[in-house]
Regions:
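A short linear hydrophobic-aromatic micro-motif
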Residues: 37-44, 79-81
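Residue-level "edge-of-site" marker
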Residues: 46, 84-85
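An amphipathic, aromatic/His-enriched active-site/gating alpha helix that lines ligand/cofactor pockets
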Residues: 58-84
Length: 107
């Protein structure tokens, strides 16, 4: 499965609702991901540009796109981005492939 990082900023309305009735959203996030065949790796709540960060594994980019669309449609976030991440093994493989590309294109 591929690894993805999802970052989002809550709307003022969503943040106000959370302040009024604090709830742990991790289980809801986990359940939503599992519904589409994805698996939660870690969730964090940074302060700064984004309010929530979710790292998850999904079978493909289409699944990751469906997660982002579902969150956007719920209207709870004002901005978000999904980043496809390489695993350590994928990173190493890309470094090795780069040598092949470089050697073929070297002057």
């Amino acid at each position: 499965m591929a690894l993805y990082m999802y970052q989002a900023s809550y709307t003022a309305k969503s943040m106000a609702a959370q302040l009024k009735e604090p709830q742990d959203p991790v289980e809801a996030i986990r359940s939503a991901l599992e519904d589409v065949g994805a698996e939660l790796v870690v969730t964090g709540f940074p302060f700064g540009e984004y309010d929530v960060l979710v790292v998850y594994e999904a079978p493909d980019d289409v699944t990751a796109a469906s997660v982002a669309m579902a969150v956007a449609a719920a209207g709870e976030v004002k901005s978000a981005k999904t980043t496809r991440m390489l695993s350590g093994q994928e990173w190493l493989e890309s470094l090795r492939k780069r040598r092949v590309v470089h050697s073929r294109n070297a002057p």
